[in-house]
Design a protein with these regions (language model features):
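Conserved hydrophobic/aromatic beta-strand scaffold that supports enzyme active sites
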Residues: 17-22, 64-66, 115-117, 123, ...
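Alpha-helix/helix-capping structural signal
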Residues: 37-39, 72, 121, 143
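Residue-level signal for nonpolar/aromatic packing positions in well-ordered secondary structure
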Residues: 3, 65-67, 80, 126, ...
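Short N-terminal binding/cap micro-motifs at the start of the first secondary-structure element
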Residues: 11-15, 41-43
């Protein structure tokens, strides 16, 4: 099978596509076929060597796919289930303690591979109405926007939200805020991206 590796000392020129053996499966792990991955700024920082990683680390923190095989102790998933990643696979519930916040794609191998072995708790179900490609964008950018608007911002209908830039988090924030009945103002230096934001229901634009 194939996977992308970041070889020391990092840099885009040190991203290598390698043929490797299929991963072995621990009792509490599943074998997952990757159908889609998404790129976040975190992944660029890892690739450039700005976030320290082990040599030959497999990058990408977000991915979606289906279960090919399950370990003997796995109870949450069955073969054929459609699943996607979570940002912090070791943080299942309770307070977000530092020791639980290991991140896929830098502390542990990520989703830039055809097949991976991963703990069953590191995945969640893909909503039935989403494709693999759509689901792969949710874990980092989508949940960051949700936490900012809902958990921290307590956004209400008819309030105004300023979205700075047109990256993944901003585009999610725009759509979530519109769904909640808020007015959205956006800033961007890209006419092309602003045209896309208009299609998504942007209220007011600043360039």
């Amino acid at each position: 099978m194939r996977q992308i590796q970041i070889q020391k000392p990092g840099g885009l020129e040190n991203l290598k596509l390698e043929n490797v053996d299929a991963p072995s499966l621990a009792n509490d792990e599943v074998l997952m076929k990757i159908h889609a991955s998404s790129l976040n700024y975190h992944d660029l920082m890892v690739a450039l060597g700005l976030i320290p990683t082990d040599d030959k680390r497999v990058p990408l923190s977000d991915g979606a796919g289906e279960i090919l095989e399950v370990g003997s102790d796995v109870t949450k998933w069955k073969i054929g289930d459609k699943v996607m990643s979570v940002c912090f696979p070791n943080w299942v519930d309770g307070p977000p303690k530092y020791e639980l916040l290991s991140f896929i794609g830098d502390n542990e191998d990520g989703y830039a591979a055809e097949v991976i072995a991963i703990k069953e708790t590191a995945l969640t179900k893909i909503p039935d109405n989403l494709s693999f490609s759509e689901a792969a964008t949710l874990p980092c950018a989508g949940l960051t926007a949700w936490r900012a608007l809902v958990d921290e911002g307590n956004l209400k209908k008819d309030e105004t939200v300023l979205v700075q830039g047109t990256g993944g988090v901003s585009i999610f924030a725009l759509q979530l805020a519109k769904c909640m009945g808020a007015k959205v103002i956006a800033t961007s230096s890209s006419e092309e991206k602003l045209a896309k934001l208009k299609e998504l229901g942007l209220s007011l634009i600043h360039i």
